[in-house]
Each structure stands twice: as C-alpha cells, then as structure tokens.
C-alpha cells in the first residue's frame, strides 16, 4: 500500500505502514496505519516517551507489555480491541482497531452540538457496561473522558485508550503518583 505521509511522520511502525496522523495528545500520537498481513486499517498510538536500557526502563517495558497483553484480552462490543503492542527505536506503541468515521464525544461537549438526553443515557449505559466488564477482569481504565469515548457512525459507543490502565492484583502494574487527566 502506497501511503502519503506528512513530513516528520514515520513511514512504518513495526510491520505497519503509516497512512497519516489522526491525532496528537499529551502522551502520544495516533496514526491511521495499514496492517499488510491482515489487509486492514488499524490505529497506532505511538507514545512520546522514549525508553532506555537501565533497570527502571526494563521494568517499565515489562509493565507496558504485561498491561497491553491484559487489555488485549478484553473482548467487549464497546471496547476497541488491542491487536498488537511493541517498541520501536525506544518508543512504545499500541495497535488497535481503527473505527472508521467515529468521532470522540469531545465533539459533542459544546453548546450547539450537545446530544439528546436519551442518547446520552444510552451512551452512559454502554460505557458503564464496558467498564464493568473490564473491571470484572481486573482492568481499570483510569482515564475515562469524552476524548476516550468514540461515537460510531451508526450511533454505537466504543471506549479507547486503555494506555494507562491499571491491571489489578498484578505484578505488572504499579500505581505511583497521579494517573489520568486532571
């Protein structure tokens, strides 16, 4: 697949061909990418922080991969699945399903673009069910907010970015300081 990329955008991340940047946040950049093996589009979050080779970095790498593996086992219709995770040039990345045409709920948090109350109740219900499912499997999202909830073109809801999830009762997660959005 011949991808047109912006200057400064990587051509590839792991085995995935980068198509274009989708968004940029405080912890990383999300790219629409293509998986050549499965022939499907994916979203890749490439984290800004680089990882060294000292003991703390090795532990952080182990935690990241363990958490990605746990979150990757979540299978719920309202949670965007993780397909893969890895590290390239000292930067970690997570590969998820790309939900074509979806918008984050942030787009509906301003006057003039508010959703009808019955739709808001439905969204909250679906989010609560998805979070309950994750919690029942020992995974806590820790950063649920409008920009981490997608509204699909058909009106369904998908929670994204378990990037700072806490895996409860696990030796791969630890909680130090503050996590999530203010």
Identify the role of each PLM range:
Residues 2-182:
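Conserved ATP-binding/catalytic core of the eukaryotic-like protein kinase fold
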């Amino acid at each position: 697949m011949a991808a047109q990329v912006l200057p400064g955008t990587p051509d590839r991340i792991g085995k995935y061909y980068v198509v274009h940047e989708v968004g940029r946040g405080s912890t990383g950049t999300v790219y629409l990418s293509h998986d050549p093996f499965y022939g499907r589009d994916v979203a890749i979050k490439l984290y800004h922080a680089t990882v060294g080779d000292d003991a703390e970095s090795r532990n952080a790498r182990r935690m990241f991969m363990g958490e990605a593996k746990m979150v990757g086992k979540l299978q719920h219709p309202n949670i965007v699945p993780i397909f893969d995770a890895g590290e390239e040039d000292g930067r970690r990345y997570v590969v998820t399903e790309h939900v074509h045409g979806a918008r984050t709920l942030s787009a509906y948090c301003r006057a003039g673009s508010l959703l009808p109350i019955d739709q808001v109740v439905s969204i909250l219900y679906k989010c609560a069910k998805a979070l309950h499912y994750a919690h029942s499997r020992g995974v806590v999202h820790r950063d649920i907010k409008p920009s981490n909830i997608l509204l699909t073109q058909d009106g369904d809801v998908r929670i994204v970015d378990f990037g700072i999830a806490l895996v409860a009762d696990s030796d791969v997660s630890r909680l130090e300081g503050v996590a999530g959005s203010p």
